């Protein structure tokens, strides 16, 4: 058991017994921990323990069992995200993906900073779909998946119209397409963008602009990568998959009003 002060991100909370809450917090100093909050639905902590909030927490951290929040300060929320069903859905997915990417108790300050900055940019109005794609690609290594979208897996040439091979877990240049008759037949811009996504700085994110058709192709291929190499199926991702169809219906109804 140790007393600790750390910045923390609320991943989720759930009811526990009658009036209490269990709260999963990704802390910068102690990794992901489950916290017990007595009277969580109506007590002092009720506002700060809502998903996607960030604060400085004073806490008691236990290596085994539940940890406890003693106090908090500097609470922040993402008002633009939580007021938009689309942004909220994507942000919730990023939180769930973060939860899946590392084990509880593993300190990962770099991932914490990346998640926080991604949500800050989403809050500022940057493209939430592309921000999500970039996050998905850069977090792959947390699942033990390391893919090279920069060069041909055979001759290591760069800057060519590449395709992806699951057989070789890498790119094929035109001279080596025949090495895999079941290659992906991608639009060459897909691996080009994924190569950029792997190394983008936060400032470069502000200048990224991708057309809708290319977004669709990126979404399809990244889904295939996760199916083939990661194998997780998150409820929040399934919700996003259905979002465009019923979201379009909602939009039509709003226009009718």
Curated annotation (Swiss-Prot):
Keywords: DNA damage, DNA recombination, DNA repair
Signal peptide coordinates: none
InterPro entries: ARFGAP/RecO, DNA_rep/recomb_RecO_N, NA-bd_OB-fold, RecO, RecO_C
UniProt-listed SUPFAM superfamilies: ArfGap/RecO-like zinc finger (SSF57863), Nucleic acid-binding proteins (SSF50249)
Keyword Cytoplasm: no
GO cellular component annotations of the record: bacterial nucleoid
Keyword Lyase applies: no
Gene3D superfamilies the record matches: Nucleic acid-binding proteins (2.40.50.140), Recombination protein O, C-terminal domain (1.20.1440.120)
Main function: Involved in DNA repair and RecF pathway recombination.
Family: Belongs to the RecO family.
Name of the protein in question: DNA repair protein RecO
